């Protein structure tokens, strides 16, 4: 039987070679199951289970002009492997007149695999149009793509998928994958997972980008449920679509009726451990899930950003429509921005949503229709929400919904809307982390299940639930601020504060069914309120609980600017119980930096009201609260408004700030890094000057230049300073170019430019300075027998940019220029000259450097202004050096070095005058101290072959055992 098949294989191979393009080749290594459709029946008999896995080598360009010979059919039950030697292109095939699946490949049995066997192995599917499934590949079993350099599909059309299978579809260890402009008149614009059993679409260990762009799934009258998954669609319940350990993943401008990019209604869509940016941009759907429609969506352990931007759904879930959404253990930022849903859930529509931030997570400018949920809509029975700020903050800002009212209305700010009675709502923030709602949260359906804030169940060795949950009206524009609904969050559920801080600020209002505090603090800033949910509130609903409103840690929050508004706590028909003692909440410490508020007496009030009783028997207000940190000094004193002292239903608590008039500057704001940055320009000039002079050897016979020399190389330098108080570090790196012209046998002129980038900082200070400088230089060397005279002149312009990081919001930035000039004049004298091979000499130089920094003012909150400052230094280095030359007719090894001692005979250290204009406070800032004497060591080697040379040059300056500065350069040199 084996002999029969081999004979048939040869016949079919000849048939294919006649029928197809000459550039297309197939090499059968075992037996042939790659056949034209018309001969399929006779082959099935011979490719039974008696044979093992089929392997065929394939490459070339095959056109679809002959439709009967284009489709390759396989049916080996043990599987068929296509070995892709180099580039395989399958293009220009059209078969729309009859329904038939499988355009380029049709696999009837066993797994079909496409395996790259060369570093350039690739497959291209172009313009394959069929009336059936799988315009590229249709398989009754699994499909696999492995080890391909490229896998591309472009401009193809089918009833469903370019790749369609009734079993798993896997992509493993490929490099570049791109699927663009493909159409399915059914489901799955690119990939369709069919079958009666759950299957998996997997992308694993891809080395390059994965791109799905401009793919579509359209409605087909002949298919009951169509238009699903513009890029990928899974039909069967429990199917899985997973991207594991890949690099960049992009879904852009895909569209469908459901799931603009991915559809897997009753299955899982998961992104796990990918190292490149995961991006869903401008995908759209006529129904639900602008980017993704699935049962469960998970994105975990990503090490690069996740971005959902400008996705759109005509119904729900502008970005994601899923029963369950889980984001956790992602190490980079996550952004949901400018997504929209015409009905609800501008970014996410879900029943269960669990989000944990290990880096920042931001929902910004998402929009929903009248169902609400500008960012997130939670529906279904007993929805649940868990937001946890672990190592990053979570923020909702600028999200809106269009309320369903009879009157024409502007969009209303809304971050989250919980439509049904929730099973669970949890907010937890790690210490020094926060969850910030600049847009309200609405949960109107009543429930006895509490909203848990910083619950102890989140406590772990790595997580302390002592962070801040913020409801704020700070980012509203003026027109939006006038509508109180844009600042009001409502929970028709009990709210429990266990730990950390609940901050209601900048005119925000929090309305709750009941409130109980067992730990932590609740803070209200002027114009903000906490109220129980009653029929008298702006939003009508159930009467609030009669359980006492209990607060055992009350703080008054301060805004950045003075306010005459009071804050409120309204208990309605419930008793109000206060215990503990009051405090002031200003985590960013902006109040104490503001002269308008903190330099003068200031007062805040909080109104307490209850129709039952206000119990303050365990609430003490005697102890003042002083400012124990930097800023304007003073203390807060608490008292009851006199006419409310004995009132048991209405009280006003007053906090009065009494300043002392003293201002203490925060140590990290002194700005020592600014004058210290002049040493960065000094290092730039010094490095360029040394690099120029070191290429001028004293003896003309040692210099590989007759008339003209050109030098190009890389250069790097660093400088450190140490003291008992602080340490600074400066580094520079870049490129240099020099032209050397021999004017006479004893007179050499050189000139060039050096371009270097740099970084500098002072330890324990949050100021980081980046620099970019250019040096123009010129040098002259005159040899007068045993005496050599050298001079150099360098001029530099350095651009500096600084960011000052802060644990608070008051980051500042600055840009300024620094100018520098350096001149050197020196002489060396030969002590020993042995046949132009070895030379020992002594030297003495004078090096004068002047650096000027321009004045500048930071940008940001309460910026600092720094006056111009100067660094002047005159140094005299002396020492002993050597030169040697080993050469033959073609090669030469040249060396030069010295050991010296340098003494600064004049030094003006940089000191700058600084000022805080907002606080009318000024001081002086000093750079780090740099020693005025040090030892230097330098060595240079040049390896020359005829007119070409390679060089390496190293210079180190040290004091005792501590290095102060060092530089290293290397490059190429051509002399004529």
Swiss-Prot record:
UniProtKB keywords: Cell outer membrane, Cell wall, Membrane, Secreted, Signal, Transmembrane, Transmembrane beta strand
Keyword Secreted in record: yes
Protein name per UniProt: Probable outer membrane protein PmpA
Domain Autotransporter: 671-976
Coiled coil: none
Places the protein is found: Secreted, Cell wall; Cell outer membrane
Protein family membership: Belongs to the PMP outer membrane protein family.
Topology in membrane: Peripheral membrane protein
Stretch forming the signal peptide: 1-50
GO cellular component: cell outer membrane; extracellular region
Origin species: Chlamydia muridarum (strain MoPn / Nigg)
Superkingdom assignment: Bacteria
Alphabetical list of InterPro entries matching this protein: Autotransporte_beta, Autotransporte_beta_dom_sf, Polymorphic_membr_middle, POMP_repeat
Source taxonomy: Bacteria, Pseudomonadati, Chlamydiota, Chlamydiia, Chlamydiales
UniProt keyword Membrane, yes or no: yes
